[in-house]
Every structure is written in C-alpha cells, then in structure tokens.
Amino acid sequence: MLLGRGMSEDSLYDYLHPSLDKLSSPYEIDGMKEAVERIKQAIANKEKVLIYGDYDCDGICAISTLMLYLRDKLDVFYFIPDRNKDGYGISVDTLERILAYHSPKLVITVDTGITAVEEVEFLKSKGIDTIVTDHHEPQERIPDCIVVDPKVERKGFFDLCGAGVALKLVEALGGREEARKYLDIVSIATIADVVPLKNDNRIIAYYGLKQITKSPRKGVKMLLNQESVSAQDVMFRLAPRMNAAGRLNSAMKVVGLFLETDYFLLRTLTDELARDNAQRQELCEKAVESAKSQLAGINFNDVGIIVLKSNEWEAGILGIACARLVEEFKRPTVLFARTDDGELRGSARSIPQVNIFELLCSLSEYFTGFGGHAQAAGISMNEDKFDDFVKAANKSLLDMRDKLDFTHEISCEMELPFDMDFLSFAKELELLEPTGYQNPRPTFLVKAQGLRFDRIGFSQHVKYVAKNIELIGFSKFAPCLAAKTGRVDFEISLGINAFQNRESAQGIIQTLQFEDVDIDDDEAIRMNLHQLDCEGSANLTQTTVNRVEGWLKEPFGTAIVCFSHEEYDNVCKASEKIKSLPVLIATPRCLNPENCVVLCPADCFDFSFFNRVIVAGHPLCEGYLAKLQKESNEIYSLGDCSPKPISVSKDVLRKVYKEIVNVSRRTPKMASPHKMYAMVCSGYKTSESTFMLALKIFDQVGTVRINDKGFVEVSAKSVNLDDSIAYRNVSKA
C-alpha cells in the first residue's frame, strides 16, 4: 500500500518508525543563522521584544512556543490582530497602535509577515528591527529584514507550518532537547494547519501526540478531557475550539491555554472557547445554507469554481464554510464577506487537482491583497472587481476541464476481500498514525452482496455485523442501507472497536456505489412511505427518451427518479445511456448534481441543484409529485407516472395496534424498528411495509409513539384515522 503511494522501500522503515534523530537541521532554512544572532543580541541586552502572530491555531501555537522559550530570558510580549478590526497579517495602522503603548526594539513575526514589505519599512523608520518567520508562499517582493521562511529558497524540507518554523528557531537557539519541550504545542498546529504529514512534520506530530497523551498541559487536558489523543481529535475537537475565538473576534486569550497554569483561569478560558465554538458552528451553518441557496438552480456544467459573496456572512468562518462546499460540490470555492468599509474579504479552499495559490497569483490584478498555499488562501478585493474576477477565475478552470474531475468517485488505496482477517490488518494500520494531509487515513474498497443493515436502536445510524467486521453507516447512509440490496461497493476506513475487553474490526462507510439493484416490492414501498405525508396536485410535462438522452450529453443537471426495481429495469431497457448512469438509492452521495438515477428518494433528498428531474415511475400519491414539482427547477414525466396507492384495512390496523399494546406491556423498550416488526407480527402474516405504514398512521393520530430511545408509548384514546395524512393517502381495503 505504501509503495503504491510512491514511497521507496528504503524510506519505509523511517516512515513507520519516526525518530527525532531524523529531524532536519534548522540551519537548512535561510536566515536562521542571522535570526539566532539577532535574538541572542536581544537577550544579552535585555531588549523588549514583540512577537506578532496570526489568529489561527498555527499562529497561536507559534506564539506560545516562542513566548514559553523567551519569557524568562527577556522582556517579551505578544500581539494577535483582531480579524474584524485589524484584518489579516501585519498593518501599519495596527503597528502604530501598538507602538503608542509599547517600545519594542525587535519584532518577531510568526506564521505571518512574508508579504509585509511596507510594514517592515515602517518599523525600520522607527528604529525597530524585524525578524519575519513564516511558512506562506512569498510573492515578488519579500521584506527587507531577516527572513526565515523555508518556502523562499525551498531547500530540503520546506513544508513546515508557522509553529514548525518557530520550533526550528527554538532548536537553533537552545538545542534539540530544548525544542522537545514544545513538540506537543507544535504538533497541534502541524495537524490543524493541514501541512503534509511527512518528513519533519510526521516526526513532530508523532512525538507531540505522544507527549499530549502522556503529560498534557492543563488547558489542553480540560478542552479534550480524554486519556488518549489522536490526530483526528486534534483536527476535529481541539483545533476548532482554539480557532473559534480568532474567527469571531480576538484570539489573544487563546495563548493562555499554553501559558496559564491556574486552574480557575483555565476553566474560565476553556468554557469561553466552548461557547465561541458553538457560536462559530451556528454562524458557519447559516453561511453554508445561505451559500447553498445561492447555488440552487444554476447550471453546474458552466461552473469551474464557486465564487459567492454576502452581506450577512462573518469573514472569520468562511474558510470552514468553503471547505464544506468543496466537499459537497467537488469544486474550488471562494466566499467573500463585505466589510464595513465596502471591501470584500474572503477565504478560498480547493480540490487536490487545483493549486489555489497559483490560480490566485495568475489573477492578482483583481485583489488588494492575498496569501496562502496550495489548498487554502485568504483574499481581499474591492467589490467593483468581483464580477470580473468570477468570470476570469471560472474561465481559467473551465479551460482546464479536461484535466479536472468534478464528479464523485470512489478512490481507495486497494480492494480488500470481505472474508479477510480485518482485525489483524487494522492493527497493522495503526503504524500509519498520525494520519492527515498527504498521509491520509487509508480507505479501502470492499465489495459485498445482499447485506441487510439494521438500524442502531432508533437512531439514524445503521450497522451490519459479520464475524470478521462490523460495518457502520452514519445517518446519510441509513435510508439506502436499511434495504437489502444487490452488490454494493463500499469505501470504508478501518479501525478497532474495543468493548468490554474485546477487540473487533470496525469499518466506517465513507461512501458507496450500487453496482446492481435488488430491492423487492415490499422494501420499495417501505422506503417510499414518506411520500404519504404529502398533499397537493401536480401537472408534469411529458418528455421523451431522445430528449432525456440529449440532456445527458452534459455531465451535470439531470436526475431520473424511479420508485421500484421494476421501474428502474424498464427505464434501463429504454435507454443504454440511462442504464450507464450511477444509481443512488434513497440518499445522495453529496450535493454535486451529477447525472444519476435516484431509486426511492428519501424525504431529505435535495433536488434543487439539478436543472431537471425526470419522473419515470409511479409514486404512492399525487402529493409527492406536487412536492417534487415545487422543489425542482424543471420536472418532466417519462411515460405514465400516475400514482399507485397502497391499501390498508381498518381490520389490519386494529390487529397491529392490539399486538403493539401486548408486546409493549412485555417489552416496553424496542431494539430497532425491524426487530419490533418481528416481535409484533410474528403471529400472523403482515408485511413489514404495512407494519411501518400502521406505525406512521398511529404516530400521526397520537395512539402510538416511539421515542429515539426505543420506548413505546401507547394511548387508548379514541381517534379519527382520517386525521392522519398518510391514512387519507392510501386506499381503504
């Protein structure tokens, strides 16, 4: 597997067994010798020193590393700009405010400064020296001062994060043993800043995580509150909380996470960070939903890059929102917020095939400022340049369309046989940790036939348990995996689940692809029952197979909807082009509107990003067609799509209700809907779809309720079944 990633056999041992002895020399970075000499001079003269850093996790960790090393050696203080008041990086206005209260003789920048040409000249005019330590890409001019940025000359290993550069500076000043004290802090930045986890970065992350697990700093321990810490814990639990304050206002307080030792001050700080993160999540969710509403109805065949703006967005959360949209739509994304002075300030994120920094360099005429690296960037621009930038950026990427792939594909390291010893292999995979950017947690292709997943309790998640592995499908996969299917290709990540001193292999489903469809009529009805919650009338325009095939000449924008296996077979017989389309059962893989056939779409299926929906089958009621017509940009029928209602009698409903009452008295808590059906209907012949329909009707009239814990609540009150919209939509046998 590792050889398949391009590694040589000679490098495998060092990769699998990281060693601090293999760290590169800090003096491989140009400017390091001069920086050390100037800082030693400052220490000897007891000069006042300002450390100026960025407001993200990387900047915070870089500041903390230098502060901890220097604070008992000279008079040192730090400053982090307020994202909303000061903007990104160093500015003359911000420096003037600082100098009104402080008189440093030396300014050291961390994780910023490589573009601060004018700002360094301003400091020189005040008699203040500057050392720029950064890891971002340099532009045509670099500041006229001591510069320590591995990307300037790109010698040796140059993909350090900002805190990694700060660690190299500490090592050059105090030696490797001194630098080891800060590996835990720098490992957090290395993982959070999405730099390649190879060479020095892998060593830093490996030993830093061990340090956090063995002897965590008090603030980190309070934030995570767990014994063992992984790269995923840092990326998804620790870093977002550290970043939240800087995304909303000021990150100055976050440095206290590493500098402070008082329990009560740290408890106050960690509580504040948790609140900031909750607010950040809320703002981010609103921005993503707002961006999605702007994208609904556009033709994605003409979109090479997503570029949007809004007055309502907070600039600080746009990077996360961009990443979410990249994941959903498989395209580079740039989002802008409008500032009070009318300028647009934005963030960019990219797909692996597109170096966003190089793209922005080619379009720099449109910006008042920008910076970043291959997969992420920050941008400022005047609003009157926005439309021209959108056209130019989109043209650049559409011109590269032959080299890019905006579609969703299963991309795995290798295929694993379903009968293998997954547990032993999962244990071997632990040697790959820590995983992250350019050292990804591997995913594997597993092919299986006819699996029946059970819901995990009454949650939105499902699982399939075999002797050698447990497959878990989280909420978005639940509707499609709840049905018995034909052959499915699963992309899974592999891990170990430990419970009651027993270890087992666990495969988390990342995505899936149906290679054939094997849903029987009863399962199809059960999956379509949500349609009975809809009312209204519809008037669909008829279309033809030839016209549909014309639309399919473009890769995006057309969804063909069927409601049963038979209907899918019929439409495939009518068109080889339709037969070649990917099949989605119940739920989308993402929001990217790639041409597809949707079989038994779930209630949550969002058709708003498709240009057109083709109905090629019979729904359970006309109300569902009305819902589709309301939610679709264009909707057509291919052949007869009149409703085919299902039927249920009051006698059947009475029997099911009576059995539910009897069973709930014996067993008030149910394990899952499927097991509840087996218990209730074991004494007589009732299909699972009829049972689930009965549950839906009972829930709507208030006679039977099942909470998310599986507890059954039964009411004996007299009800009118016609109060149930589902009952009104079925035939009364």
Name each region found by the language model.
Residues 65-66, 71, 202-240, 244-288, ...:
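Acidic, two-metal ion nucleic-acid-processing modules in DNA metabolism proteins
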Residues 50-52, 105-112, 610-618:
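Acidic beta-strand-to-loop metal/phosphate-binding motif
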Residues 593-595, 599-645:
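Conserved RecA-like helicase motor core of SF1/SF2 enzymes
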